[in-house]
């Protein structure tokens, strides 16, 4: 009989969190949800608490925590409601927890994910920033405390499934020639470059294959998402940048591939649904039903591949440059991107200004080593401050109106 796993889901109201709970609900008795966490989505958290009855619920925002507590009390639930980053760390390291789904988007997910690593948990990692910003710190912590890690990103999960079962971090010793990291190319893969200057947030968030949150949808449109995944792959699989090849694959059916020295290429295929990697990681080394439909190869009919265009997708180039530089630069890249995407979604800069802001912040930041979490978080804070300064210098303020993009912000000018 399969042992019941006790779960904390960090970021339960986001797309990954909801997909995780969908899979969990299909297997009653196999998983017990001990803690759910969110930022400020009280309504969705309330619904999840009603369905799963977790002993703990954490809202990062204190006011949202108060609202949730009132609603749960009125509903007769005895779920304990906590708030703040320290509470996220607490529920990620509870002694009764064995598995943590790390699905908080952004730098806010680093501290609770590290807390899970320090207490030897089985970590299902969907938070890119933990590896992008603090890869060395996080991997060292995993080893030191004998925590285990399985990737949730569909691409890294596909790579994991395509590597030898007992892969020990030695690609060459395992006969691996290179990793082929697939990318859909996003909604603007074939759009005229001039049109990109007028792209709206709604257009950028309309991914052709995947259903995702707004931030990651914009990252997919700029291919920064793929750039961050290159950095993740470096840490997850001990791969130098030259061994990680990005391949644009518009159908999003092949989720990634591993090429071996004998010429073999192993790939993981499936419908574009995050429940597949989630179910794989939740049940590993077994397999279980995810709710995902079978892949109809006759309906797919064809598989296309293209090389990425750095002119169209400068964010991908910037990610490779940050990885090559090392030290604080991946954290700087990530912080500048988070600010740029935030202000783009707010309508304050054009789509084409996102890579301009990121590159300017990177160029104005001195490369430094970051041996610990404090150094990583400091690099993050400083890069965000630099990005805000850049924004202040490049946005014209109009009385009574939101800031308007300056004409000089377009990448083509």
UniProtKB/Swiss-Prot annotation:
Mn(2+) binds at residues 153, 155, 229. It catalyses: 2-C-methyl-D-erythritol 4-phosphate + NADP(+) = 1-deoxy-D-xylulose 5-phosphate + NADPH + H(+). Keywords: Isoprene biosynthesis, Manganese, Metal-binding, NADP, Oxidoreductase. One of its GO terms (molecular function) is 1-deoxy-D-xylulose-5-phosphate reductoisomerase activity. The keyword Signal does not apply. Pathway: Isoprenoid biosynthesis; isopentenyl diphosphate biosynthesis via DXP pathway; isopentenyl diphosphate from 1-deoxy-D-xylulose 5-phosphate: step 1/6. It comes from Nitrosomonas europaea (strain ATCC 19718 / CIP 103999 / KCTC 2705 / NBRC 14298). 1-deoxy-D-xylulose 5-phosphate binds at residues 128, 154-155, 184, 207, 220, 225-226, 229. Belongs to the DXR family. This is 1-deoxy-D-xylulose 5-phosphate reductoisomerase. Its EC number is 1.1.1.267. It is an enzyme of class 1 (oxidoreductase).
């Amino acid at each position: 009989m399969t042992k019941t796993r006790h779960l904390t889901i960090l970021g339960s109201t986001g797309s990954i969190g909801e997909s995780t709970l969908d899979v969990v609900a299909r297997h009653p008795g196999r998983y017990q949800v001990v803690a759910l966490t969110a930022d400020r989505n009280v309504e969705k958290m309330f619904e999840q608490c009603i369905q799963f009855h977790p002993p703990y619920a954490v809202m990062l925002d204190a006011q949202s925590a108060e609202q949730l507590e009132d609603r749960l009390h009125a509903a007769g639930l005895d779920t304990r409601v906590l708030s703040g980053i320290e509470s996220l760390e607490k529920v990620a390291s509870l002694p009764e927890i064995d598995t943590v789904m790390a699905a908080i988007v952004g730098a806010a997910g680093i501290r609770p994910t590290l807390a899970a690593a320090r207490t030897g948990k089985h970590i299902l990692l969907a938070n890119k920033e933990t590896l992008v910003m603090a890869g060395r710190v996080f991997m060292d912590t995993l080893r030191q405390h004998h925590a285990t890690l399985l990737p949730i990103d569909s691409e890294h999960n596909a790579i994991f499934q395509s590597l030898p079962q007992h892969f020990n971090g030695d690609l060459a010793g395992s006969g691996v020639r290179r990793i082929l990291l697939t990318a859909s190319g996003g909604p603007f893969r074939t759009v005229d470059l001039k049109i990109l200057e007028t792209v709206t947030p709604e257009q950028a968030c309309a991914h052709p294959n995947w259903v995702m949150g707004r931030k990651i949808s914009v990252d997919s449109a700029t291919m920064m998402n793929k750039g961050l995944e290159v950095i993740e792959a470096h840490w997850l699989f001990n791969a130098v940048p030259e061994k990680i090849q990005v391949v644009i694959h518009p159908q999003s059916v092949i989720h990634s591939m591993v090429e071996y020295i004998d010429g073999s290429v192993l790939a993981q295929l499936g419908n574009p649904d995050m429940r597949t990697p989630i179910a794989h990681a939740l049940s590993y080394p077994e397999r279980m039903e995810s709710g995902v439909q079978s892949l109809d190869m006759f309906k797919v009919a064809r598989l296309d591949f293209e090389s990425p265009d750095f002119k169209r997708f400068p964010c991908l180039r910037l990610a490779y440059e940050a990885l090559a530089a090392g030290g604080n630069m991946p954290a700087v890249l990530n912080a500048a991107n988070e600010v740029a995407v935030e202000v783009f979604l707010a309508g304050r800069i054009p789509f084409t200004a996102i890579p301009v802001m990121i590159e300017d912040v990177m160029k104005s930041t001195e490369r430094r080593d970051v041996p610990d979490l404090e150094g990583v978080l400091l690099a993050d804070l400083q890069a965000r401050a630099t990005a805000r300064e850049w924004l202040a210098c490049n946005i014209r303020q109009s009385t009574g109106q939101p800031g308007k993009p300056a004409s000089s912000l377009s990448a083509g000018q």
